[in-house]
Amino acid sequence: MPELAELAKNTKAWACYDCGKCTATCPISRIGSDYSPRRHVLAANSGQRDQIVGDGALFTCLTCSLCDQRCPAQVSYTQLVQKLRELCHREGVEPECPHGGALQSVMRMMAQGGTQQDRMGWLGDDLKTEPQKGEVFYWTGCTMYYDSFFTEFELKTLEGTRAAVRLMNKLGLIPVVSPNERCCGHDLLWNGDRANFELLARHNVKLVADSGAETLVTSCAECLRTWRIDYEPFFEAPPPRIVHISEFLAEHVDALEFKTDGQQCRVTFQDPCRMGRHLGIYKPPRQVLAAIPGVELTEMLHSGPGATCCAGGTWSNCDRYAKQIQVGRLREARATGAEVLVTACPKCQIHFRCAMKDPNLGGEIEIAMRDVAELAADAVA
């Protein structure tokens, strides 16, 4: 079919020479699933639309991009999967999402507008922000919903959000935090719902453009990827500089006055897929950790470009295979001897906390987790 032929061309699927490296690399395939990235490539190359639409395994893919990185033919598997999911969505096929699809429903409500949000309740009196205009826009993402939605996980993702604002205030900046921000639409896009994603993109791009901000900072790796790559077609004027909070802090680390008597703490770091393999950002969070007195970073066996995914980026992969990946990753973190697993994305925290709550593991994989900004904020005088 012409659509599949064009997609195979754009993603270089036609260049696949069936070496099997993608399957050998895939975290899902490695733990015993019969899933293989090649099945989508072969279906696209041969124009098998019915097979693609009827294959629920398309939503098994973590879109972690490990296969992209290892493919000798440079096939863009991740882009191929995202586009094939759009095809499925148009045919009425969607993934089976956990929690009754409640999170997807909230995103779609935001996309349609008219939803009354209370996005500012997390801001304490000690945090200075502007509601509309300023040089720096702090993009909060959906963290204010996560802690309330997943109460059983005892999450503290908002602590990282507060820490980011506190650090900007310490640097003499008063960021814009808008009550009119909406979900970036990352999960809708990656589950195939392009129409609602585009509604969110247009709203959010206009919101930030109207603020006059020259820089947009976010603590969410998925929001970062969405703003840098997926929002690009929606900018009518040159976009603001878009950075992760760890990049922003690394740029200003010399201006942060850290306490000289910092408590000794061994940490390890989880590289988010969207920030690492999707955007190539590895050094900034490590630069921030290296600057904090008393903090010693011990890398996991799989780190940097080879880091293992947290296995649940779009709320559509929550199955026994994802849990096995999460448990394996937490065991790897514990094996470093670290007291704290530092993250740069709230989604990583959520999925790992979920895995830790498995009663069958008896606390075997428990480890404290903190956002990189939270750790830095606690160390600032």
Residue ranges of each PLM-predicted region?
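Ferredoxin-type iron-sulfur electron-transfer modules in oxidoreductases and energy-metabolism complexes
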Residues: 1-7, 31-60, 64-65, 74-109, ...
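Iron-sulfur-cluster electron-transfer modules
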Residues: 4, 13, 43-183, 187-218, ...
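Short cysteine clusters
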Residues: 16-22, 26, 61-67, 71, ...
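A broadly conserved sequence feature marking short terminus-proximal activation segments
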Residues: 16-40, 277
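Cofactor-cradling patches in redox/metallo enzymes
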Residues: 146-240, 274-291, 295-381
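Short, conserved active-site entrance elements at the starts or edges of catalytic domains
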Residues: 238-248
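C-terminal amphipathic alpha-helical segment
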Residues: 245, 251-292
